[in-house]
A protein has these predicted regions:
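N-terminal helix-rich structural modules
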Residues: 2-168, 172
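Contiguous, non-catalytic segments that form substrate-binding/exosite surfaces or channel walls
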Residues: 138-141, 145-274
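General structural signal for secondary-structure boundaries
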Residues: 1-2, 106-107, 225-226, 232
């Protein structure tokens, strides 16, 4: 099924095993990691839905093992490192708006549509029964996955003995049900002493190549390397000096980096989604 000239590209990725030393983790943190990984898999599930228009169907049972691996790595039949060209025969070029917008929607139609949240990071654009455009918030469109993820984050929060992490997990759990992420983002920035970390939810907007309005779901489950993080601490004090020496006009250097900025090193134990 993969085009003959694309077969060589199935060899461009090398598998890497993600590992970390968990011997120094508390028993509570060891229990939390599998829960966070389970939550992350739901972000993967959503990203598949965001990436692939419903009108494009692929019979994955017809793919060889090598083809299926390449398909899985790319989250669909388009080669992400080759201009999103289709690598499966008979599949058209990927729509610029992925699955965030109807594939038959024109820019003129979208721009003429008077809808306040159409540019929101957290809405899917669909058509009503009468063919007119409607927006559906992520917390409704992905209600099943968001609810499950929220429950898992709350479960992890109950186990955690780190008050900052507990607070962040609970706020992120609530955010997934409301699509209001600011408070949990601030709580994440405020964490200082946590060993376990998770980035989760709709964050980057690169998947929407039509407008760049829509966020894609992703997750990283992380374990902080405290030894290396301590080594990086000394560089925080250099940030103002480094900024002052940037080769740009003074107006671009007016905002000084805070002395409470953090530089940390992490081992990634799980990636999911965008």
């Amino acid at each position: 099924i993969i085009k003959e000239n694309e077969m060589a590209r199935t060899e461009i990725y090398a598998p890497v095993k993600l590992t970390t030393d968990i011997s120094k983790l508390s028993e509570e943190d060891k229990k939390i990691i599998p829960i966070l990984i389970e939550a992350a898999t739901l972000m993967d599930e959503i990203f598949w839905l965001e990436s692939n228009p419903e009108s494009i169907m692929i019979d994955i049972e017809q793919l060889s093992k090598k083809e299926n691996t390449f398909y899985t790595i790319n989250y669909g039949p388009w080669d992400r490192l080759n201009g999103n060209d289709a690598f499966i025969s008979g599949v058209a070029k990927k729509p610029l708006g992925a699955n965030y917008y109807p594939t038959d929607m024109t820019k003129q139609e979208f721009e003429a549509w008077d809808q306040g949240d159409k540019k929101s990071l957290y809405t899917m654009i669909r058509r009503n029964d009468d063919g007119t455009l409607i927006s559906i918030h992520f917390n409704a469109f992905f209600k099943t996955q968001h609810t499950k993820t929220s429950d898992l984050l709350k479960k992890a929060a109950e186990i955690s003995t780190d008050e900052e992490l507990k607070n962040y997990l609970n706020l992120r759990a609530a955010a997934l049900l409301t699509d209001n992420y600011d408070e949990s983002d601030i709580a994440w920035l405020d964490m200082k002493n946590n060993t376990i970390d998770i980035i989760i939810g709709p964050i980057e907007n690169y998947e929407d190549k039509l407008y760049g309005y829509k966020a894609a779901h992703e997750s990283y489950v992380l374990v902080k390397d405290k030894e290396w993080s301590q080594r990086l601490e000394k560089y925080v004090s250099y940030l103002p000096e480094l900024q002052n020496n940037l080769p740009v006009e003074p107006k671009y250097k007016a905002e000084q980096p805070g002395r409470d900025a953090q530089l940390n090193a992490y081992d990634v134990v799980y990636y999911a989604g965008d």
